[in-house]
Amino acid sequence: MSTKIAFFDIDGTLTSEVDGSLPDSAILAIRQARANGNLMFINTGRCYQNVEPRFMEIGFDGIVCGCGTNIYYGGKELMHVHQPHEVVMEILEQVRKVDADVVFESREEVLFDLSRGIRNPAAKKLYEEFKSLHYDMSHPLEAEDYTCDKFVVWYDTCLLYTSDAADDLT
């Protein structure tokens, strides 16, 4: 029998998009597939620090995280790709030019551009979620040592952002 490999996303695949629950049936199926000699991986857009321990406790063989920027197998890091500071600064400059919201993510931290406040409702919701989890988001984006693994930009041409209207979006 040949070994097969399966990849599972977290959000909306392993867990319910409604309440984040993880069904026992999924845990049992993954463990049975491993017992049958197959490799089980998480493949998520989340960076490593955002993968909750409950997922790793299932017994996955490895994880591809950060949209492919970080790969672990057998408890060892095989690959990590990050964007250098100069690239982060170029992205930040372009995002600010179009007046969009951005979050930069890495294995260690999550940083939002707070220079103009967060206006997009989805970005604001994510910021509040990370804040409630007590993430340290205080590292200055412009610091010369700052790099990131990936970034997300929110730009909605349907929303007219003003400082007064942004408060009404929540």
PLM regions and their residue ranges:
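A general structural motif
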Residues: 1-3, 37, 99, 148
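Asp-based phosphoryl-transfer active-site loop
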Residues: 4-17
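Short, solvent-exposed loop/turn segments at secondary-structure boundaries
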Residues: 18-22, 76-79
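Active-site phosphate-binding/coordination module
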Residues: 27-122
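Acidic, His- and aromatic-enriched active-site or binding-groove loops in soluble protein domains
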Residues: 120-137
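Single conserved hydrophobic/aromatic residue that forms the stacking wall/gate
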Residues: 161-170
